[in-house]
Amino acid sequence: MKILITTDWYTPAVNGVVTSVKNLQRELERRGHEVRILTLSQSLHSWSRDGVTAIGSVNAGRIYPGARLRTAMAGRWVRELMDWRSDVIHSQCEFSTFFLARRIAEELDVPLVHTYHTVYEDYTHYFSPSVRWGRCAVAAFSRWVAAQVDGMIAPTGKVRGLLQGYGVRCPVFVVPTGIDLRRFQQEGDPMRRAVLRASLGIPAENTVLVCVGRLAE
């Protein structure tokens, strides 16, 4: 299949969406699919190379740290992607590139699938002093996004439950975000581990469990 992935976030940015997109791209290509990426440039300059098309944008960090908004006209770049004729469009973000994804899907008459990465309820303090009003706005926005697509992917059952609670009517499928286990299966240096244990006061015979989580404001 030819699969076009659209995302406001891509390298060199580092966050969960970028990690998810890169993992998805790698695994789809490993299985023999052709994948192209439509994203935002880190400058006003649009470009296309190595299967990635980036549309000129400006910094929108006042809305959310690291965010960008499309400013450049995308006609030429969209036409090139239409000529490629993807079989399905997989959107990863709800803003700048989502509108391009919808436009391309409509022109090509192909399915548009969207992954709902962000629980916006947790970030309403960025735009609303009222938690209740913020949740209502998120629910309405999520319903609008769902009405534009043929199906949504939720990374967890919790997120699917939230979407259903918002009144989303399109099909919602739970597909957990994958992890590249190869990064964690490398043998460490025994001497380095011993030095680290000693520096932390952990006896050699003790089992160590490490929990990796996140802190969000």
Give the label of every model feature segment.
Residues 1-45, 49-56:
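N-terminal subdomain of nucleotide-sugar transferases
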Residues 39, 53-56, 135, 139-191, ...:
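Donor nucleotide-sugar binding/catalytic pocket of nucleotide-sugar-dependent glycosyltransferases
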Residues 89-122:
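An aromatic- and histidine-rich active-site surface loop
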Residues 6, 155, 211-213:
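Short hydrophobic "strand-cap" motifs at the C-terminus of beta-strands
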Residues 191, 203-217:
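Conserved donor-binding/catalytic core segment of Leloir-type glycosyltransferases
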Residues 113-140, 182-187:
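Acceptor-binding helix/loop patch of EC 2.4 sugar-transfer enzymes
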